Amino acid sequence: PALCEAACTCGDVTGSSVTVRENEHAIIETAYAKGWLHAAPPPSRTGKSIAVVGSGPSGLSVAEYLNKRGHAVTVFERADRVGGLLMYGIPNMKLDKSVIERRIKIMQAEGVEFRTNMDVGGAVAAEELLNGYDAVVLCCGAKKARDLNVPGRDANGVHFAVDYLTSVTRSLLDS
């Protein structure tokens, strides 16, 4: 259930809370199934170019809104797939990867360019972006997990959550 469902006051009257998550899911899935959602490129372009570093939730949001304003947007992602934490940090049982992939396809059709395997600050110099774009937006995720100084932390089989989820998801996507 969505976080608000536990505190929903409709339950006081009807006996159950409003199933917000399920309602929203049904609406969006119906819209996709019936073809109501389609690419809507901006009517005009500003001539400005923006580099977005990172394709996680914030990077995708920034890219979408800047593109809608008419800017040419290029998203740089260090991983081999777009989506950041959405793609690698959330298990498929919670967020099916096809949901992310279909949204990316719409964004591409609207004019957003995605470049994967592009490690900005590594193989791609930051100066290259600063010189090649009118603006650069940093939406990079935390690559290094925070370690805990607790007994057993270094035991066999103890992993950082995002590292573990990334490994499992990558193996599923590559199979």
Locate predicted features:
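N-terminal Rossmann-like dinucleotide/flavin-binding domain of flavoprotein oxidoreductases
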Residues: 3, 23, 86-134
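Ferredoxin-like iron-sulfur electron-transfer modules
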Residues: 1-3, 36-53, 58, 87-88, ...
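Residue-level preference for short coil/turn positions at secondary-structure junctions
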Residues: 46-48, 131, 154
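Glycine-rich FAD pyrophosphate-binding loop
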Residues: 71-87
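Redox-cofactor binding/interface segments in oxidoreductases and associated redox assembly factors
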Residues: 138-139, 160
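Glycine-rich dinucleotide-binding loop and its adjacent helix/turn
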Residues: 27-44, 105-119, 145-175
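Rossmann-like dinucleotide/flavin-binding elements
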Residues: 51-76, 115-125, 130, 144-147, ...
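Iron-sulfur (Fe-S) cluster-binding segments and ferredoxin-like electron-carrier domains
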Residues: 2-30
